[in-house]
Amino acid sequence: MLSTPSELDVAVAIPAPGRVYRGHHILEAVPLTVLGSRVLVIGGERSLTVAEPALKRNWARDPHTQIHWTTYGVDCSESELRRLQALAIEEAITGILGVGGGKALDTAKLVAHRLRLPIVTVPTSAATCAAWSALSNVYSDTGAFERDVVLDKAPDALILDYELIRQAPPRTLVAGIGDALAKWYESSVSSGASEDALVIAAVQQARVLRDLLLQGSLAALQEPGGVAWKQVVDACICLAGIVGGMGGAKCRTVAAHAVHNGLTHLLGQRATLHGEKVAFGILAQLRLEEILQGSQLALAARTQLMELYRQVGLPLNLRDLHLAHLGSAELLQAAQVACQADSDIHHLPFPVSPEALLVALTTTDLTGATPATPKL
């Protein structure tokens, strides 16, 4: 008798979208027939404004396709998901097209996942790898992180139109750099001593990704549309997605994203982007390694990152996150969320308490020798 998948030790990898289209002015040309004849377009207001002309030219070739346009609100929250699912059912939607940044695409992917519909993603910034991944993050209506949802599949297609990305605010690319950098600093820890060939390859891909960003980010920001810019855009959307897709759960998040999740529970956190919080979280993760393990390698890595952060405008400290006004009690609340029992911070090879994390959060830009390990 054959065992069912649930009875087997099965490693699942969802490495990539079904198809990845990359180019300039391609949104109006790429076939969208996979979505069927009744399509729901979900996106942010700015993103829909930017993408709508090209999409309308695309669908003008097929007048029988009915298009329904809607914004997703502010967050990928359960209330928004329920509203959009009801709309899709009411309109007998046959496919979902997600347009925008990370939260818009996460929303579109999760609606498609729940309704078992095809999904095509169209990123309008390089702020995250959401257009690539088989994962959606769910937030409360006030923007506090609640959980992530692993999807059954990556998008059926990803349309990366560089002209759309070039129109995005430069800050979104900076945030994407911060989010993508975390792939190395987290996957190199979360992968442990894995002997799985795909995990090993994913971690090495994360190293390549990190090096590309360290070397090319400043040039990319100085010349939007140039060679370095295109490489960094591809790195933030595609290479970062490959790491998580190929490595699976072994190559996902650790302390950097746990810090992000904790910070989302603070008032005022909406002033910063996902990747900015994650970038700050990388520094906090490295500080934990310094504080709790006395790691000189972590100090060297943090020093290297701080120089890049200064060059491109990523946050070095709580002041840069517009959170310097918060007291220890409020910051400890964020640290407690980040250290909950099911938090990815516990993928670190040493125990972390909220009190230790609080020290790390308040000393991310500390320079010089690592102080002695505090009694926490």
Question: How would you name each of these model-derived features?
Answer:
Residues L2-E7, S295-L376:
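C-terminal charged capping/lid subdomain of soluble metabolic enzymes
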Residues I177, L181-Y185, W229-V243, I282, ...:
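Short alpha-helical scaffolding segments that buttress acidic/His motifs in well-ordered protein cores
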Residues T49-E52, K103-L110, T128-W132, R252:
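Short glycine/serine/threonine-rich phosphate/pyrophosphate-binding segments
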Residues G18, H113-Q205:
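A glycine/threonine-rich phosphate-anchoring loop and its flanking beta-alpha core
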Residues M1-G95:
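ATP/NTP phosphate-donor binding region
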Residues E195-Q311:
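Active-site segments that bind and position negatively charged phosphate/pyrophosphate groups
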Residues A88-V111, L115-A126:
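A short, small-residue-rich loop immediately preceding and capping a beta-strand
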